[in-house]
Structures are given as C-alpha cells and as structure tokens.
Amino acid sequence: MQRDEQIFDLIQEEKDRQIHGLELIASENFVSDEVMEAAGSVLTNKYAEGYPGKRYYGGCEVVDVIEQIAIDRAKELFGAEYANVQPHSGSQANTAVYHACLNPGDTILGFDLSHGGHLTHGSPVNFSGRLYRPVFYGVDAETGRLDYDKIQEIATKEQPKLIIAGASAYSRDMDFARFRQIADSVGAILFADISHPAGLIAKGLLSDPIPHCHIVSTTTHKTLRGPRGGLILMGKDFPNPQGLTTPKGEIRMMSSLLDLAVFPGNQGGPLMHIIAAKAVAFGEALKDEFFTYAMQLQKNANAMADAFVKRGYNIISGGTDNHMMLIDLRNKNISGKEAENALVKAEITVNKNMVPFDDKSPFITSGIRVGTAAITTRGLVEKDMETIVALIDKVLTNHTNEDVIEEVAEEVNELMSERPIFAY
C-alpha cells in the first residue's frame, strides 16, 4: 500500500513545531518513546469489550494481562483500592461518574468555568449542565482563591447530591479535607477531578484527595505524562448511596456502578493500545526519576510566576502551588486572544483563558493560562524561566511589531532546537 505522504509530511511538520517551539499550554506534555511505542502498537487491532476475565470477545488473554497491569499500577501510584483505566478521556471518565452517582435533574455543585473550572463541572453547553441542575462556587474577588466558607453556604442552600472539587485553571492547592466536611454536612458525594495536578499529587507534592473524596478522576496526560485518556479511582469502595441492588437483591458497591457506567453505559470497546500506554506511563510515574521531574516542574512554575510578577503581570491568586498560572492581562492593555496569536507567531504556545469576573467573551478573554509541564520534560530549569518570561514580555509589549516577533521566534528556536523532547 502506498504511503500517505500528505499525512506523514504533516506529522513531521508538527514534530518540528514541537521541537523548535516553547510549549507552555498547561494541559500539554511530551511522552516517552516507550509510551508512544505502546500507543502505536498492534494492540490497536484488538477489540476487548468488557473487563479482564469478563470479555465479550475471544482472544483477550494478552490484553487481559495488560489491562490488569495498568489497573494495578494506577492503584499503587495513587494508593487507591479501585481503578478503572478504560475511559477514553477525562470528560468520559467524568460522564461515567455522573451516570453512576446521579439521576437526570439532580443538583451538582462545581467550580464555575469562568473562574477556573471545567466544562464537565456543570457548564450549560456541556452534558453536565444539560442533564443535571448545576450550581457553582468561584474564587474570592480579592484573593483569587477559593473561599470554603462561601462554598459551605452554597452547599447548605442548594443541597447538591454531588460536589466536584477540581479545576482547569486554578493555580492553588485544594483543601480536600474541607471539601469533605462540606459534602458530609449536606449528604453529598465528593468527587475530585485532579486532571491537571495528578502527577504532582501522585508524588506527594500536593494535597491527596484519595483519603477524603468518595471518587477521583483524572486524565492520564498533562502532569502524569501519559497518553491522552481518562482514569477513575476510589480510595475505598462503598455501597452505592442510591440503594441500587443486584438481581439477587444485594446492594451494589460503587465500583460495580462505575464499571457499568464506563462499559456499557458510556463506551463500547476499550482502546487497548492506549491502556497499554497508560500502563507504561504509570510505571514511569512510579520511579524516582518522575519524583525528580515533578519537583522540578513545581520549582519551574514558581520561578516563572515570580518572574511575571516582577514584570508587573497580575497572576490570579498572586502565584502558584502547582504547574500552572492564570495571568490577567487587563493592566497590559492586551486581550487573551491577541496575546495567544502574537505568541504563537513567536513559536511560544499558550492558550487564551477567561479570568475571574472577566468582562470579555470566551472567544476573546482577558487572560492567558501558562504551564510548565512540557518545558520541564524537555529539561528546562529555574534559570530558564526568567529568559522565557522576558521573551513573552517582549512579544506582549510589541504584539503588533512583526519584526520583534520574528526576532523572538529566532531566540526561541535557538533556546529549544537542540534540546531533547523527553529529558527525563
């Protein structure tokens, strides 16, 4: 069969872009050759509906072992009693959690998308805001941080069945123990979505949700540095609070409802090549080298936030505890969209992002979100953060000057072109 030169030329073009540029999108990272090898393996040919030992297809002896390894490694990595490695994405993991815990119309309490939450935490354009009744908490206008007393007030008033502790653009650690107190006070299930800080949490560098939250979900890329996919965890299994029973009349455990919500409730055949890649990534994350990486990632984020503050940029909440920061650009007289477009021309990729109490649309925004996961994988350290912030500042203060932008692009290429994609 003739090689598809059009597609493979574009893949090479994208590889060149990744090698020569600065990747600062907080949700992106680079995987190891071994993770890519597993994701591109013959396992993509295998259908395996069901779970290990309970498949609807023959010939699953090998993939059963692979999936069980992925499950066992995920449980070891996070100290969990239960893991489901089949969700194709974080959004589908969250969908399964909702289906297992809720009925249509039930009230959910989540982090407002415009303050740093995620689409699947109740946004009206998402299934979570259409099938359920969403109410929201946000950050304090002065501090840019969560106000747990205010969250308690909202929970007491609205009586949600599910409380979501998680974010896509919040740079501070979360107090899961306080969230659990709030959830218990109203009889709600506490569900943590740790898709962004999962790698830091797994290595003990941020608060651990597993002892406090009934259910935890995460993506397997971002700071976990695995393939794109989802994962559901529980520290301990428990009887489902809805009182649903088996055909024999026994109360179903939540693990059973979660498994059923993933398959057949939400998905058909699992992606065995991606599950194998997840297993490889979990194995990498269990090693000491990953702890070194996670610590450096956090140090880089702090150094970058400090450098931005010194140059007069407004970091929401004043800094960061994790791998990212949300920058309000209103005092710089540039929109998030303008900043993103100018930086992309300079081969620096960030994403425009709404900031709390934003007065611009989601297509324009007043801010950008910046993260250090990918550049840390490439071997950059604290001293490089000042250089990067200086380059960003140069672009943003000259965002209509094509000559300056081209000059910065050359500096970026010089900084990055000789660095490996995967340094750890």
From Swiss-Prot:
Annotated site (Plays an important role in substrate specificity): H221
PROSITE patterns xref list: SHMT (PS00096)
Pathway: One-carbon metabolism; tetrahydrofolate interconversion; Amino-acid biosynthesis; glycine biosynthesis; glycine from L-serine: step 1/1
Subcellular location field: Cytoplasm
GO MF entries: glycine hydroxymethyltransferase activity; pyridoxal phosphate binding
Gene Ontology terms: cellular component: cytosol
Superkingdom assignment: Bacteria
Keyword Cytoplasm: yes
Top EC class, one word: transferase
Keyword Glycosyltransferase recorded: no
Named cofactor requirement(s): pyridoxal 5'-phosphate
Biological processes annotated in GO: glycine biosynthetic process from serine; tetrahydrofolate interconversion
InterPro entries the record matches: PyrdxlP-dep_Trfase, PyrdxlP-dep_Trfase_major, PyrdxlP-dep_Trfase_small, Ser_HO-MeTrfase, Ser_HO-MeTrfase-like, Ser_HO-MeTrfase_PLP_BS, SHMT-like_dom
Residues involved in (6S)-5,6,7,8-tetrahydrofolate binding: L113, G117, H118, L119, S361, P362, F363
Subunit structure: Homodimer.
Name of the featured protein: Serine hydroxymethyltransferase
Organism from which the protein derives: Flavobacterium johnsoniae (strain ATCC 17061 / DSM 2064 / JCM 8514 / BCRC 14874 / CCUG 350202 / NBRC 14942 / NCIMB 11054 / UW101)
Lineage: Bacteria, Pseudomonadati, Bacteroidota, Flavobacteriia, Flavobacteriales
Gene name linked to the record: glyA
